[in-house]
Amino acid sequence: MEFSGRKWRKLRLAGDQRNASYPHCLQFYLQPPSENISLIEFENLAIDRVKLLKSVENLGVSYVKGTEQYQSKLESELRKLKFSYRENLEDEYEPRRRDHISHFILRLAYCQSEELRRWFIQQEMDLLRFRFSILPKDKIQDFLKDSQLQFEAISDEEKTLREQEIVASSPSLSGLKLGFESIYKIPFADALDLFRGRKVYLEDGFAYVPLKDIVAIILNEFRAKLSKALALTARSLPAVQSDERLQPLLNHLSHSYTGQDYSTQGNVGKISLDQIDLLSTKSFPPCMRQLHKALRENHHLRHGGRMQYGLFLKGIGLTLEQALQFWKQEFIKGKMDPDKFDKGYSYNIRHSFGKEGKRTDYTPFSCLKIILSNPPSQGDYHGCPFRHSDPELLKQKLQSYKISPGGISQILDLVKGTHYQVACQKYFEMIHNVDDCGFSLNHPNQFFCESQRILNGGKDIKKEPIQPETPQPKPSVQKTKDASSALASLNSSLEMDMEGLEDYFSEDS
């Protein structure tokens, strides 16, 4: 991989050449990109792809895949993030280019562990399934050929000749349906799953597969190719990570939160200390609700709890003076000497507001940060209840929150499937009595803001939109350099030679 200071350029192609580069709205990503892009575009494409795949995950849990609602919402996300989704749309080159490059960027970030690879493959498969489902029938054969799949649609004459055998082997087909259904001739080895289920007609080493069943075979091929490609990329990853300009981004990308950071406090001072107890039961997510309850009962929280809860309170509008008063009043109830609080704990509170030390204005923790870092130990109350609680204790907690038995079962099923944020979103919908909250939950402060918007009839203070957040804290003093600050500090004229990436995606590396 090479970087240079040459003037940034993109591959410029004439109309026909551009279309030839990306003939379809979906692909198997067989060839890595070979153009130069700026590091800023590299970062932006990566962030947008993460947003897209997380939307794919959330929608796949919230809706039945393939339903009209699922299709409509996923298409909306693709449109919003400017990725390709349909054939025959005008000026599709740029969305398809973004799709191609961003996929390979995320391979670098998500090849680093088995868990990351598994998640990445599943979301990419679901995305491919959606795109294939809306691919016009007259484009399918070309797509299969471009994807190097030896699947060929048989002629009407062949279909008529084998009609009886095909219908007998495919329970959902009738003679009438067969007339409108494309049948594909596929090598037997590629249709083993259908053969095991006795759902396919075999003849001379070939399987005759209806279009409705070919999707599973295509997805299996895609999974196998992508899994192998990620393993090859992982072998070459040390060479990529040796570049100090890419290493921070790749290390943080798979675990980064890309939404609003809730550090811009348009509602500073709008929350009074007297309101917190009531707000904790009405508008706090379970992670903050349990921290508030523990603080009121024990008059103390350990460092992890103070950081998680303190920054959340800061994000919903508590001023520095209010925060000092809130924590001091509570800790003194626990028999702490006021002087000890002033000399020790008050410094940490001022520090979190950017008034001490390196003057870092810390941002509230996102769901991903809470889920993935600093798990609670005995005596701790921080963390995510859906991720870190014993299922039976979580069930009891939900019962105390007056969640219905059916609702508790839904939430526990989501937790069992490791969909912790979706479980919290389901909790939000239940306590606010809404069927669809209309957003993907990614942040405790988002939970609070959306709750207040519902309870106040949409009249709560809306925060100004800000740039995507990178791992906390905001400035580049955290650990080494966070992903955004590392890239932002580079001269924007630097470019990345995408041709160099080929070494990391091929078997010869």
Swiss-Prot record:
The keyword Ribosomal protein does not apply. The RNA:DNA duplex-binding domain interacts with the template phosphates at positions -2, -1, 1, and 2 positioning its bases -1, 1, and 2 for duplex formation. Interacts only with the beta- and gamma-phosphates of triphosphate moiety of initiating NTP of the primer. The side chain of His-303 mimics a RNA base that would be paired with the template nucleotide at position -1 via a hydrogen bond, thereby facilitating the stacking of the initiating NTP. The interdomain linker provides flexibility in movement relative to primosome platform composed of PRIM1, the N-terminus of PRIM2, the C-terminus of POLA1 and POLA2. Together with POLA1 interdomain linker, allows for large-scale conformational changes of primosome and coordinated autoregulation of catalytic centers of PRIM1 and POLA1. It is proposed to move the C-terminus of PRIM2 close to PRIM1 during initiation, then move it away with the 5'-end of the nascent primer during elongation. This is DNA primase large subunit. It comes from the Eukaryota. The modification Phosphothreonine is found at T470. [4Fe-4S] cluster binds at C287, C367, C384, C424. Residues 461-486 are annotated as: Disordered. Its cofactor is [4Fe-4S] cluster. It holds the Pfam family DNA_primase_lrg. Heterodimer of a catalytic subunit PRIM1 and a regulatory subunit PRIM2, also known as the DNA primase complex. Interacts via (C-terminus) with PRIM1. Component of the alpha DNA polymerase complex (also known as the alpha DNA polymerase-primase complex) consisting of four subunits: the catalytic subunit POLA1, the regulatory subunit POLA2, and the primase complex subunits PRIM1 and PRIM2 respectively. Within the complex, POLA1 directly interacts with PRIM2. Belongs to the eukaryotic-type primase large subunit family. Residues 266-509 are annotated as: Interacts with PRIM1. Changing F104A: Decreases primase affinity for POLA1 by 40-fold. GO terms for biological process: DNA replication initiation; DNA replication, synthesis of primer. PANTHER family: DNA PRIMASE LARGE SUBUNIT (PTHR10537:SF3). Keywords: 4Fe-4S, DNA replication, DNA-binding, Iron, Iron-sulfur, Metal-binding, Phosphoprotein, Primosome.
